[in-house]
Amino acid sequence: DASPYYHSCFSKDNAITYCHFPSTKYHIDSENIDYLKTDLGMTERSNVFSDNKDYVDINNPKNCKTKPQFSRRKEYFEILKYGYWNLMRNSTLITNSEFSRRAIVNAFGSDNIYVLSPPIDIETFRNVALMANGDDETNDIILVISRIAPHKKIENAIKLAKILKDNNVSKGMKIVGNLYYYFFDYYSELKQMVLDLGLTDYLTFEINASLDKLLSIIRESRVYFHPMIGEHFGMAVLEAMAAGLIPVVPNEGGLTEFVPQEYQFNTIEQAAEIIMHVFTHLPKTERIKISNDINKFSNSHYIEGFQTILNELLSRRRK
């Protein structure tokens, strides 16, 4: 639904819309320019030819204004609003968690919504990471996987790192995530925060890492920390759990539907206490149990769930 498309022939019997979370509604209602830029990829180009008419690569992010001003903003949002509202009202809705389902109900007043969690490549993370782990003593990294974006609240991870370093917990923290050019300023702020808190020897960033690189870091890790409060689902958390990492997550959002309560925190200080306990008292068998607990998020389970929804739609059409 983040890039809404609507056709007049759509109905709840012949169209399915996956709604991750009703964020698009609020972006459109508030006429959020950043939504046009980051979600829809719309930018107002700078001059694409230099004074001497030399060709300039218009696909180079450096040649785009970082804060576009759209002269036809009202028109864009009217079109989006028409398409989005009709799409949501005239299709069968699927979302990723009960947390997201409740948010959609509050936004649209419709309660006929299916919950189908996205599939996780469990075997890749379980076989390559968990089964390859050696002695627990060598796996002391705290891992964060997140896009480098302001709403992901990466600063919470940095605050946690400060507490853990001061208490001599873990060998360090690694933050792995993709970075897009329009969040370069935020990334610079995070790096400055690391410098100011004296964490350059404890916390490192791995930007735009490959899957092989990510799996290599997972092999070094024991705990996964999730910094964002109110996460809608959290695929990275499940991938880490598949690899046998202990998840430490906020006690609000879709994550609470599958992360054991003893690993949920309300404050950064509580998160630090949980991690200290994991490092000093938790046996390796608990990591294996965590990995085995997420089989319901497999590809095969997702396919079965989606087929069930399709069969219900087809049976309605036959009536």
Where are these regions (language model features)?
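Acidic anion/phosphate-binding donor-loop and adjacent secondary structure
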Residues: 27-28, 105, 111-114, 120-137, ...
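Carbohydrate-associated surface elements
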Residues: 99, 119
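A conserved mid-protein helix/loop that constitutes part of the nucleotide-sugar donor-binding site
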Residues: 140, 149-166, 185-186
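Nucleotide-activated donor-binding/catalytic signature segment of Leloir-type glycosyltransferases, i.e.
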Residues: 187-209
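Aromatic "clamp/platform" in nucleotide-sugar-dependent glycosyltransferases that forms part
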Residues: 229
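Short hydrophobic beta-strand element within catalytic cores of glycosyltransferases
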Residues: 237, 245-249
